[in-house]
Regions:
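Extended, hydrophobic alpha-helical segments in both membrane/secreted and soluble proteins
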Residues: 45-112, 128, 132, 197, ...
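Flexible, glycine/charged-enriched surface loops at secondary-structure junctions
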Residues: 1-4, 67-74, 106-114, 168, ...
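A glycine-rich phosphate-binding loop feature that marks nucleotide/adenosyl-phosphate handling sites
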Residues: 3-9, 74-79, 111-124, 213-221, ...
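Phosphate/diphosphate-binding loops
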Residues: 81-162, 242-286
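N-terminal glycine-rich phosphate/pyrophosphate-binding loops that anchor nucleotide-derived ligands
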Residues: 1-66, 101-105, 117-125, 150
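Active-site-proximal betaalpha loop/short-helix elements
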Residues: 186-253
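Short, acidic (Asp/Glu-rich) active-site segment that either coordinates a divalent metal cofactor
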Residues: 33-35, 68, 149-179
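Conserved small/polar residues in nucleotide/adenosyl-binding loops
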Residues: 288-295
Length: 298
């Protein structure tokens, strides 16, 4: 509701409006476009500030990749309680170190930012809340990708390995009422490798739609893509040792949902294999129908 109140079509150059992974605006007189995304995750940073700092940079990186943009740089807004409190200051230091580590590895530099301390009521500070704004470049905006499912019978893949991490997830905190445990681990090699491989696939016109997997896990990402595209999906869980709850609601990092045409599927999977990128096949797009409780169609 909030972002809908703002004018996001100034001069008619907006070619992907808010509500997707990133907003995209054309650059006058060229085929280029700039993508921008803003992300924050107080829950992960509260559970483990260093991992949370890395995660929010990676989330920004993935959001830009998912629209077909090469990530260029980030700015930050770091919101914390009183630095006079040792715990608050420790959270700040760990979070900044995590941001720096991810930025350096992903070649996604911090070029500006600000710090806001003393965010508290009486002596109780807010959760550590770093906010990252990322920008990326699309060399040809005709290759921009959106998240909505496009075509019936196209194949849906998950790029990236699913381990079934449930601690600190939306599902665990809001459905299971479990608020302890660490956030998902960040593997920076996989983040970079998965993202750069997907970007190559997008640039070679092999991907029809894409969306990163974040809060709510695979099931939430799939639901958004179905709703946006007014499509359904014949959803199947790969034969993993983890159970369905862990597979569909886990918030393991470095993952994307992508839509691929059947004629391009072999090309895509060969490229993923060649680059050592794990993937699972989830199912195929359907005409939208009301789901039956006896099946796993969405």
């Amino acid at each position: 509701w909030i972002w809908q109140q703002y004018d996001h079509t100034v001069m008619g150059d907006t070619i992907q409006k808010p509500g997707g992974d990133a907003g995209v605006v054309r650059v006058h007189g060229t085929n280029k476009a700039v993508a921008a995304s803003v992300d924050s995750s107080a829950v992960y940073c509260w559970a483990h500030p260093h991992t949370g700092g890395k995660q929010i940079v990676c989330e920004s990186f993935r959001n830009l990749i998912a629209v077909g943009a090469k990530p260029i740089a980030i700015t930050n807004c770091l919101n914390f309680g009183s630095p006079e409190n040792e715990e608050n200051m420790g959270e700040f230091v760990e979070c900044v170190q995590g941001i720096g580590e991810a930025s350096e590895y992903l070649k996604f530099p911090v070029v500006s930012g600000n710090v806001s301390f003393y965010n508290q009521t009486k002596d109780k500070g807010i959760k550590p809340t770093p906010t990252i704004g990322g920008v990326g470049l699309i060399m040809d905006y005709n290759k921009m990708i959106t998240m909505d499912f496009k075509q019936i019978d196209n194949v849906i893949l998950v790029i990236g390995k699913t381990e079934g991490h449930l601690d600190q997830t939306l599902f665990a905190r809001n459905i299971l009422d479990e608020k302890n445990g660490p956030p998902p681990e960040i593997n920076l090699f996989n983040e970079k490798n998965n993202g750069e491989t997907l970007l190559k696939l997008i640039q070679n016109d092999l991907i029809k739609s894409a969306h990163d997997v974040s809060l709510g896990g695979i099931i939430t990402a799939i639901a958004k893509m179905c709703i946006k595209g007014k499509k359904g999906i014949n959803l199947n869980k790969p034969k993993y040792l983890i159970n369905e709850m862990e597979y569909f609601f886990g918030e393991d990092q470095g993952r994307y949902i992508v839509e691929v045409s059947k004629k391009d599927l072999k090309k895509v999977t060969d490229i993923l294999d060649k680059n050592a990128v794990h993937f699972d096949e989830l199912g195929t797009c359907l005409l939208y129908t009301s789901p039956s409780p006896r099946d796993r169609s969405i």
